[in-house]
């Protein structure tokens, strides 16, 4: 994925940007610099023009990261249906929760499989296959029919994230 962000150093509000991903291009007029974006900018941002300001950004606290994961978890519970991307989003949340790092969706899905976190590994494997070749596979009627059936598996994987978040909260971390 490639994204462009224009950041106000005083408010940490992005005044605009473009995001390119497998679902296409989106142009945003404004969005907040959330903990995930801050982590990516600080660790992996590439300056294209102007003065590098990453040293002026504060790395998100563990509590901020946990709150961001919690918000994403709530979105998965509310909207997570019939789209393999929700499985990969869940894997990214788990990866960040366990490592305090950010990973690409594909890498996070592979990591979740390697660490035996997926209650339905065959579903994650199919999600990764779609992620690697979306133009071909999303035109396949059998794939689109399959996607309509995976809501229970998305929510079951969200259970894994819920349990990991609860375990983190009980270990003394604040959300």
Predicted features and spans:
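Hydrophobic alpha-helical packing segments in soluble, helical-rich domains
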Residues: 74-106
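Short glycine-rich, low-complexity/disordered patches
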Residues: 2-3, 86, 174-175
């Amino acid at each position: 994925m490639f994204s462009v962000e224009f950041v106000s150093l005083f408010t940490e509000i992005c005044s605009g940007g473009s995001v390119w991903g497998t679902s296409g291009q989106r142009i945003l007029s404004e969005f907040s610099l959330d903990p995930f974006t801050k982590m990516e900018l600080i660790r992996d941002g590439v300056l294209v023009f102007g003065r590098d300001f990453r040293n002026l950004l504060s790395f998100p606290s563990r509590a901020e990261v946990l709150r961001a994961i919690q918000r994403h978890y709530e979105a998965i519970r509310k909207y997570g249906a019939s789209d393999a991307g929700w499985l990969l989003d869940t894997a990214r949340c788990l990866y960040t929760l366990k490592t305090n790092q950010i990973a690409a969706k594909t890498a996070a899905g592979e990591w979740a499989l390697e660490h035996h976190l997926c209650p339905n590994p065959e579903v994650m494997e199919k999600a990764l296959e779609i992620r690697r070749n979306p133009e071909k596979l999303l035109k396949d009627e059998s794939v689109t029919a399959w996607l309509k059936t995976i809501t229970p598996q998305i929510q079951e994987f969200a259970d894994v994230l819920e349990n990991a978040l609860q375990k983190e909260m009980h270990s003394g971390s604040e959300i």
